[in-house]
Amino acid sequence: MSSASTKPRSANGVSQPQNWVGFKEVLSEEAFRRMISLERKRSERTQRPFALLLIDAGCSQLCDKQGRVWLDILSALQGAIRETDVTGWYTTNSVVGVVFTEIVLDNNPVLSTILSRIRALLRDGLDADQFSRIKFSFLVFPDDWDSQNPERPSNPTLYPDIEKRQESNRLGRATKRLIDVLGSLSLLAILSPVFFIVAAAIKLTSRGPVLFRQKRIGEHGTPFTFLKFRSMYINNDSSEHKEYVRQLIAGQAEKKSANGNGESVFKLTNDLRITPLGRILRRLSLDELPQLINVLRGEMSLVGPRPPIRYEVEAYEVWHRLRLLEAKPGITGLWQVSGRSRVKFDDMVRLDLQYARNWSLWLDIIILLRTPAAVLFGEGAH
């Protein structure tokens, strides 16, 4: 790139064009992405939103030929944004961004005015072809996550720290996937007699299909069809469970415990929807076996966070969403072997995040080895 190329990153993470004099500092890609991550974490903690504007110049070739393009873009930003806003490279020499801190979302005229002014300045400063190539993206956290549509995949743009961590561990993720495929195929073959016996028992003891299918929310908010052996009567009412899940996530379940002893559990006890055979299947976790098919399909892993139901995600707090981004859902996980259903919801999410951020093949092996004991002797299964 000619006049718009950047100098090497300085010690404070600031990049500036070589002929840029008197302009507001522009953070380097590394520093700006770190800024986005810190601002998001602040928003998760305080519930105060922020906004991110990204401007893509269209193609690097255009910028190489027209070195003024980036200077015009940065000049427009300099003339429009507030003193408290932060400018930086989201992708060096390709996408520039602005973090708008301390915003008020309800009919906020300030942001609308800023965006309109930036567009107007660029339209006046660039020729029509250059302006037509520019793409604008505007994201608001946490409102960018539509709570009424939890099946919409999340936007990784606001989570550069997670994206970086996953990119740096591609080999580990590929190895984990290989183990999932080989493990699920082996277990499906070995346990095929158990599948047949359980399926026959379900058909003989209650009306309805052998398999229970339910829409669950997977990695990055992607929905998938979750499989279990049916343990409930058909045509049951889920309203009580929906309300209990809402109370549990809100931290109110201890006041009105499902098991009557003051402990909060994730699953309802004395649930009249469950068949007598279903209670046995759940106690031994045999109802979970069809999830090996989900693992083979790549929708789940042998080890990972529990995949949530849609109405559960609708009740999530902002920081709870991280469990959908950090790891693929699994059949068993750290929280399951740390108390199973009796772990409080916030603690369950913390254990899921702890697992994802400290993941290793050895940790997966430990969890898999501890799972049979948790199934046989744990008191939390229902």
Task: Name what the model sees in each region.
Residues M1, R34, T46, E102-A189:
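N-terminal hydrophobic signal-anchor/signal peptide
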Residues M1-R40, T157-R170:
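PAS-family sensory modules
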Residues S15-R40, E44-L54, G58-Q78, N108, ...:
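Conserved long alpha-helical elements within nucleotide-processing catalytic cores of c-di-GMP signaling
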Residues R40-R45, L74-L105:
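Conserved helix-loop-beta segment at the catalytic/binding core of cyclic-nucleotide signaling proteins
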Residues S168-E243, L361, I366-H382:
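A hydrophobic, helix-centered structural microdomain
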Residues V265-L268, R282-H382:
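Hydrophobic structural segments characteristic of membrane proteins
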